[in-house]
């Protein structure tokens, strides 16, 4: 095992050791040479899920004063260099001062100095940067690697795109588990029934509150239901359609936040876009459900179909709006939208859907 650890990249070394028992990991570390032990100790000292634990410290660097021809010859002598798509340029103090792509290097006259062709505006991260922020930067700028710098701008290592792909998958899985109210542990299938129950309890409690609220509203309109029993038949449809479109809208927004696609300042445009989507879908399904109600419940009032159709349309517009606004509000309050969006949306839609349905019925059916 020690020989495997020794040959692995530094970020993989810490990953392997972290999944082992402490005593086993320590015994393996003691078999490594002093330099390897120091590097592993440094990597494992960074916070969990940070850039420091992802980075590879075996980075190929070049001095800014050498020429492109000298750089190519130096590169040819390197074996096992990590990610040579980018060449990192340093100064006399080993500070990172620029970066050059491999393509730019090979298409530049051999006598040109690196400092004259390097890109000086560098997107870098600190070792403490959260891995989700690292993934967002890579996705936003389509980088193959991102340099990790200390407070003195010295290059500590790089986080490569292959490591970021793993992070994106892990974070997406975690967010979806949270939104579904199933906790955030990616290994949830390995947990006990009791641990799974505890993870799901808060989300289901919020749904229970929404159900109680909806039941209370229905109770207030029991006379209306007694006069027109057909109204009760469409309550599940209205709540179901509203809940579904709210979940769709909130999922789009939460994932957009996680990937950096939803930017601060564009919220109003986003809200109106989802309202438009809700109106289009609500009108379509409202017409279909209204026609169904009209020809199925022939003994009910003539305008029952109109009431049902309008209610489903209003419910879906409101649900799409709520599903969009709640994650945005939670972000403003520094509350993780992935955790809290589901309960708030579920509770709100249950109550608002029933309320709008009976208010519209009361107005147009004159009850």
State each model region's role:
Residues 1-235:
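Cytosolic regulatory modules rich in charged/polar residues
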Residues 65, 172-321, 325-339, 343-347, ...:
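Alpha-helical transmembrane segments and their membrane-interface boundaries
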Residues 351-352:
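Active-site His/Glu-centered metal-binding helix of metallohydrolases
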């Amino acid at each position: 095992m020690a020989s495997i650890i020794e040959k692995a990249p530094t970020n993989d070394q810490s990953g392997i050791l972290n999944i082992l028992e402490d005593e086993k990991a320590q015994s393996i570390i003691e078999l490594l040479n002093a330099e390897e032990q120091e590097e592993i100790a440094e990597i494992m000292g960074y916070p969990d899920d940070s850039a420091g634990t992802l980075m590879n410290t075996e980075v190929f660097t070049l001095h800014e004063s050498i020429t492109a021809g000298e750089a190519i010859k130096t590169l040819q002598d390197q074996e096992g260099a990590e990610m040579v798509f980018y060449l990192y340029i340093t100064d006399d103090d080993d500070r990172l001062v620029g970066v050059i792509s491999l393509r730019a290097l090979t298409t530049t006259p051999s006598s040109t100095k690196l400092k004259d062709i390097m890109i000086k505006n560098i997107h870098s991260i600190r070792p403490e940067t959260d891995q989700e922020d690292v993934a967002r930067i890579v996705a936003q700028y389509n980088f193959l690697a991102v340099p990790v710098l200390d407070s003195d701008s010295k290059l500590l290592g790089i986080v490569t795109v292959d490591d970021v792909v793993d992070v994106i998958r892990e974070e997406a899985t975690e967010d979806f588990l949270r939104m579904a109210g199933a906790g955030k542990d990616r290994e949830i299938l390995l947990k006990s029934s009791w641990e799974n129950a505890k993870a799901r309890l808060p989300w289901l409690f919020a749904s229970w509150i929404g159900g109680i609220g909806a039941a209370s509203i229905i109770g207030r309109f029991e006379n209306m239901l007694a006069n027109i029993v057909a109204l009760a038949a469409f309550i599940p449809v209205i709540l179901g359609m509203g809940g579904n479109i709210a979940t769709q809208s909130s999922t789009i927004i939460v994932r957009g936040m996680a990937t950096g696609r939803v930017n601060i300042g564009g919220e109003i445009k986003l809200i109106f876009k989802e309202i438009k989507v809700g109106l289009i879908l609500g009108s379509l399904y409202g017409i279909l459900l209204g026609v169904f109600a009209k020809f199925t419940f022939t003994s009910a009032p003539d305008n029952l179909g109109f009431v049902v159709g309008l209610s489903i349309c209003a419910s879906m517009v409101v649900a799409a709006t709520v599903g969009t606004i709640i994650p945005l509000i939670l972000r403003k309050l520094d509350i993780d939208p992935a955790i809290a969006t589901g309960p708030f949306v579920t509770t709100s839609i249950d109550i608002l859907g029933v309320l709008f349905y009976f208010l519209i019925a009361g107005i147009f059916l004159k009850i």
